[in-house]
Design a protein with these regions (language model features):
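Residue-identity detector for glutamine
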Residues: 2, 15, 67-69, 73-76, ...
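Dual-mode signal for accessory low-complexity, basic/Gly-rich regions
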Residues: 81-215
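Short N-terminal helix-initiation segments at or just after the protein's N-terminus
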Residues: 55-73, 159-173
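Residue-level signal for secondary-structure boundary elements
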Residues: 30-37, 67-68, 187-192, 197
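Amphipathic alpha-helical
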Residues: 65-90
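A sequence-level detector of short, solvent-exposed, charge-rich linear segments
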Residues: 41-44, 48, 64, 70-75, ...
Length: 215
């Protein structure tokens, strides 16, 4: 399955691009049909940029939403970690709904005002690995009493703190070819027959409640 989104009709793929995507999907399905059945594997892995985006959105982003720090049913993964390191010090995370494009890519999380009328603004969530704040609507939580313009809602629902455009930045970077070499080296170091490279992830799903296996 593959979906396409665009800011305007002109941004949608051409007929030729759609046909190329269909052919690529067919090749992928054929490869899956021929692929051997695999067993659970414990070993080194690398996520591509696209796969890492889904990972950060689901695993980290949802747990930094303000309302998830409230209530006994929530896992509250990071509630008590403000001011503490939660990521390596070369990583920082922000959420910026004011930017409409990243390079040539249109960002669907952009907005001028959130659903509570607050003007959109960038929020630095994690700086140099240290947790600074949460994504806030006007619903207060302990030590955070006001909105930071991330109150968003589906039709008919009360606005809550939600992600816009989650941006992960790093002070360390290497070429993809070098990452692949490091993956092979790590697999050999761990005496594993191979490592895993995740090119894409079809979708994400996060449950943050206390009784969930994901909590």
């Amino acid at each position: 399955e593959q979906t396409f989104e665009a800011e305007t009709v002109d941004g949608l793929p051409s007929q030729a691009d759609l046909e190329a995507a269909m052919r690529e999907l067919g090749r992928s399905l054929e490869s899956l049909r021929k692929a051997p059945v695999t067993e659970p594997f414990d070993g080194p892995a690398i996520l591509s940029g696209r796969a890492a985006a889904v990972f950060f959105h689901e695993v980290l982003g949802h747990r930094l939403e303000g309302q998830r720090q409230r209530g006994e049913q929530e896992g509250q993964t990071f509630t008590k970690d403000v001011g503490k390191p939660v990521l390596p010090d070369f990583l920082s995370v922000s959420d910026d709904p004011t930017i409409r494009r990243f390079g040539s890519t249109w960002l669907s999380g952009s907005y001028e005002y959130d659903d509570e009328g607050e003007k959109a603004r960038r929020v630095d969530l994690i700086s140099d690995g240290v947790l600074k704040t949460f994504l806030m609507s006007r619903l207060p939580i302990a030590n955070f009493g006001s909105s930071n313009s991330h109150g968003r809602a589906e039709t008919g629902h009360v606005p809550t703190g939600r992600q816009g455009n989650l941006i992960v930045s790093s002070t360390k970077s290497v070429l993809e070819s070098e990452l692949r070499k490091q993956l092979i080296e790590e697999a050999k170091k761990q005496s594993k027959p191979y490592g895993l490279y995740f090119e894409d992830i079809s979708s994400g799903f996060a449950v943050t409640t206390r009784r969930s296996p994901q909590a």
